[in-house]
Amino acid sequence: MVDYFDYSSLLTRAREQLPEEVFKDVRFEIPSADSFVEGNRTIIKNFKDIAKFMERDPQEFAKYVMKELGTAGDMEGVRLILQGKFGWRMVNEKIQNYVNEYVLCPECGKPDTKIVKEGRIHFLKCTACGAMKPVKTL
């Protein structure tokens, strides 16, 4: 008599039923900010593309970058114009900080997250593993 409830066969059967995305180990790489200094302003040419890649609201993302850099700025089409001179390294560092805090899941490390509001608290909810982490509001 064959044992259908053998642990290894159950484990194999369970793994076969999982979607392929679970086993993919794709590194999430944000496009580098295409920024340059013009006079006393820093312009990020591909800002909206970066926000779209992360699936975040460009206005909220811009608010975070401006707050972190301690400056004012304005969205103009697909560009973000910041008051002040900032090097590309500093701009990319702030973008990476945003990704680590507001995009990547702290449990599984995947970028499949959404920011949801429950009551007065904002949470980073992972659609891949279901984890929820409270995040600071912008």
From Swiss-Prot:
The coiled-coil regions, if any, are none
Q: Its biological function?
A: eIF-2 functions in the early steps of protein synthesis by forming a ternary complex with GTP and initiator tRNA.
The protein's name in its UniProt record: Translation initiation factor 2 subunit beta
The UniProt subunit note reads as follows: Heterotrimer composed of an alpha, a beta and a gamma chain.
Key word Ribonucleoprotein present = no
Task: State which gene encodes it.
Answer: eif2b
Keywords assigned? Initiation factor, Protein biosynthesis
Source organism of the structure: Methanococcus maripaludis (strain DSM 14266 / JCM 13030 / NBRC 101832 / S2 / LL)
Superkingdom of origin: Archaea
Entries under NCBIfam families matching the protein? aIF-2beta, PRK03988.1
Q: Which Pfam families match?
A: eIF-5_eIF-2B (PF01873)
Matches recorded under InterPro entries = IF2/IF5 (IPR045196), TIF2_bsu_arc (IPR004458), Transl_init_fac_IF2/IF5_dom (IPR002735), Transl_init_fac_IF2/IF5_N (IPR016189), Transl_init_fac_IF2/IF5_Zn-bd (IPR016190)
Q: Name one GO molecular function term.
A: translation initiation factor activity
Q: Could you say which protein family the record assigns here?
A: Belongs to the eIF-2-beta/eIF-5 family.
